[in-house]
Structures are given as C-alpha cells and as structure tokens.
Regions:
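Carbohydrate-active catalytic/glycan-binding domains of CAZyme proteins
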Residues: 1-198, 202-214
Length: 214
C-alpha cells in the first residue's frame, strides 16, 4: 500500500492516516470482501499531484508475474470533510476523469483486476516468476520494444476486470484471443455476478476476434 501520515511539524508528531491506494485493492469493500485481493501485489511507489484542481495518487501495478516489472497508474483522490483521504479504488480510467467510453477497442493491459481460483496477495516470492496457473499481463518482443501488452494464462477461473466503462447502448462485446485453447469467456458486470453473455473461443496460433451478444 501507499499510506500517509500527518503532522503540524515537519520532523515530529506524525499520526498515521491510512491507505491512499493498494495495488491489489486490499481493504476496499465497496464491491468485494475487504480482505480479498483483486490483483497480484508487491511493493508500491508513487506520489500525489494536483492537476487542474483535482488531486491524484500515482502508483504502480506489477506485470509479467514478477516483482520487477511495473505498470504506471493513477487514480483520483477523494477527501472526507475533515481532510482525511478516502482509499482510492483501482480502476482502468487513470486521468480520464470518469468512465471510459464503451465503444471502440481497448488494450487488455489496462485490466485493474486480475486473479484466479489460486488466490495470492503477492506477485511472487522475490526473484521468482508466477507459474502458468496465474494470469499475468505481458507482451511479445524484447525489453524496450513498443509492443501492446496482453493477458497471458487465461485459464479456467481466471478473471480480468476493467473499470469503469459507460456501456449504454452496447449490444455486443468482442475479444481477441491467441492460443491453444477451447472454451469460453463470460462477460460480467461484477466479479461474482451472473454472466451477461458468453464468448466461445477456439484454437489459433494467430490473434482471432470473437464476438457475442450481451
């Protein structure tokens, strides 16, 4: 977590204020149990910036199933009447200022929730990789190549969450899949909700687009 403390002095008397953001959404209870991790966390670094009158917390999420690969993120900060900070929920929106438009194409690497039935708060023990049981954001190419990221290891029970989208008027959802697989993706509006639609997929060693009604 990135946390904060306050004091009337620069060098003493600090009082712990709480969590500003957790890179696994720990302690957030607005959409899931407070202790349930919704991403694979490790350490966290960041800072607070005011942009056009709105305060933001910058932080990072982890990618590639290791503690050493990081994705820069930002969330708006809300304050209580007494000036204390309300913990920010992880989203896919960044500095957008509201829900993303539900039309068009978005990269999978903006997923703000990523987990499976093998629950883990941490990305991996230091120096180790998360094995093939766990979904992870990755990319093709070598270090420094500008390649679009995607989610690897979307196996049975793997869940990727994207928040928030304005999907008014949306009747179809498409995904692009590559891999030796057979099954389907379920489209939901909550991690434990009922499916709004199902997208069957099949084997392919190139990216294929699949579409379903919702």
């Amino acid at each position: 977590e990135l946390c904060y403390a306050t004091s009337k002095y620069p060098n003493k008397g600090f009082t712990y204020g709480g969590v500003i953001v957790s890179n696994c959404d720990l302690y957030i209870d607005s959409y899931k149990p407070a202790e349930k991790p919704m991403y694979y966390a490790w350490n966290n670094h960041g800072g607070i910036v005011e942009i056009n009158g709105q305060w933001y917390i910058f932080y990072h999420r982890h990618t590639n199933g290791t503690p050493f690969n990081r994705q820069a993120c930002a969330e708006p900060i809300r304050f209580r009447d007494d000036g204390s900070i309300i913990q920010a929920e992880m989203t896919s929106c960044g500095l957008n200022g509201g829900p993303l438009i539900g039309k068009g194409e978005y990269p999978a690497y903006i997923a703000c929730n990523l987990f499976c039935k093998h629950e883990s708060i941490y990305t991996a023990a230091e120096g180790l990789w998360m094995d093939a049981r766990f979904p992870k954001i990755t990319q093709d190419g070598k270090d420094g190549d500008e390649e679009a990221g995607y989610i690897l290891n979307m196996r049975d029970s793997a869940t990727a969450g994207f928040k928030y989208f304005d999907c008014r008027g949306i009747e179809k959802v498409s995904i692009k899949v590559r891999g030796y697989c057979s099954g389907h993706f379920e489209i939901k509006t909550s991690w434990d909700g009922e499916p709004l639609g199902t997208i069957p997929i099949g084997f392919s060693n190139i990216w294929q687009e699949y579409t379903a009604d919702i």
